[in-house]
Every structure is written in C-alpha cells, then in structure tokens.
Amino acid sequence: MSPNPTSEFKQIIEQQSEKILNPIERTKVTQDLSENVILTTVDDLYNWARLSSLWPMLYGTACCFIEFAALIGSRFDFDRFGLVPRSSPRQADLIITAGTITMKMAPALVRLYEEMPEPKYVIAMGACTITGGMFSSDSTTAVRGVDKLIPVDVYIPGCPPRPEAIIDAIIKLRKKVANESIQERGTVLQQTNRYYSTTHKMQATEPILTGKYLQSATRQAPPKELLEATGMPVPPALLTTKQKEEI
C-alpha cells in the first residue's frame, strides 16, 4: 500500500514554512571547525600588516647605497618582502642609513627622521655608519656612530655589506615588529648608545708618500741621454738650475 499522501503533503508544507520563517539555517558544528576558524588578536593583525609593508626611504650618503640599490634590482628583488622605496619621509616608516654621516649631514638626517610618521625604524648599514669606519681615526667631520643622532634598531656591519646582509637585517626587523604591542604606538623609547668613541691605540708611522718624488731631478728635467737621443736642445732654464746645483 502507498503511504498516506496527506502526511507527506503536511511535511512538505512544514519544511517550506520553516524556510520562509528562518531563511538562514543554523550553523552545524563540524570536525573541520579548527581548520576554518582563525583566532588572533588585534596586536597580531596590526603587526602582520606593518611587517608585511615596510616602506624604506631612498637615502644614501656613500658607497653602501650602491649595495642597497642592487637590492632593488631583479636579482634580489626586495619587493617580495613588501618593501616599496619612497622618496618622501612622510610616506616611509623605515630609513636605512647607507654611508658615512658627516657633521654637515647630521641635522638633515635628524630632520628626515623627525618627519617620518610613527612607528618608524632605523637600520644602520655599514661600518662608517655604525662607528665611523676608516674615518674614525683621523677625520674631524665624520660622526662616530649614527646612534648618537637617532635610535637604531638593527646594525649591519661590513664595508660595504652585501645585499644578502640587508635582507637578513630586514628579516630581523620583521621579527622585532611582530613582538610589539599596539599600546606602545606613539611612545618614543629612548635607546642607549651601543657604540661610543674611544681613543685608538694605533701607532703613528711616517707616511710612505711624502711628495718628495715630485722634486726629483728626473721629474724636473728629462735625462741627458734622452735629450741627446731625441736631438732636443736643453732649455736654458734647466742649464742654469744644473749650474746652481753643481756650485
């Protein structure tokens, strides 16, 4: 015997009425819930967005900037880290001090750093930026460490560092950004100087090039044999100087 058609009809009407009253069905908890839901915090989301879009400012004062320029090329391609070079400090949140910082350039560097919006970061690139480098012993205009002017987050030693070293510094900076909190935004943490000037212990020696070779007789006048071979007459001025030397 066939089932009662009236009961089936009633069930269909009840199902349709439930869909009309509740068009959205109740969510069913499945075993794949842990794979479909991401639990995070505002700090993690905020830090992830910042570390994935660090915008460095195009700034260089010496030969280290050549290595930084190579990093922009297709071989190393730092765009894959989300880095977009900017020419304005108001659009940058990272400055890489590539090269020697002199006393004359120091006020301009501090002004560029102050014009950058918070939060901002600094990477000191090269020995000349960190300690003054080869100019730290006898130069009167080189700054012995850029951290005397602005706080530094990551140091890259080398003369000059390779592009791979810059990538490693950026990765370390990304790890530092990932551990920050949104509550610290806008607070300027005063960093102590990690490098300081000391008197060097190098012994002064006599210079090799004294300039006396410019006063040698062979540079003042060509050899006599050369003049006789070429048939050139000896200038009278040179003859008088030779006579004075003999006297």
Curated annotation (Swiss-Prot):
This is NAD(P)H-quinone oxidoreductase subunit K. It comes from Microcystis aeruginosa (strain NIES-843 / IAM M-2473). The keyword Nucleus does not apply. It is an enzyme of class 7 (translocase). SUPFAM superfamilies: HydA/Nqo6-like. Belongs to the complex I 20 kDa subunit family. The gene is ndhK. One of its GO terms (biological process) is electron transport coupled proton transport. Its cofactor is [4Fe-4S] cluster. InterPro entries: NADH_UbQ_OxRdtase-like_20kDa, NADH_UQ_OxRdtase_20Kd_su. It is found in: Cellular thylakoid membrane. NCBIfam families: nuoB_fam, PRK06411.1. Coiled coil: none annotated. [4Fe-4S] cluster binds at residues 63-64, 128, 159. Keywords: 4Fe-4S, Iron, Iron-sulfur, Membrane, Metal-binding, NAD, NADP, Plastoquinone, Quinone, Thylakoid, Translocase, Transport. Its EC number is 7.1.1.-. NDH-1 can be composed of about 15 different subunits; different subcomplexes with different compositions have been identified which probably have different functions. It is a peripheral membrane protein.
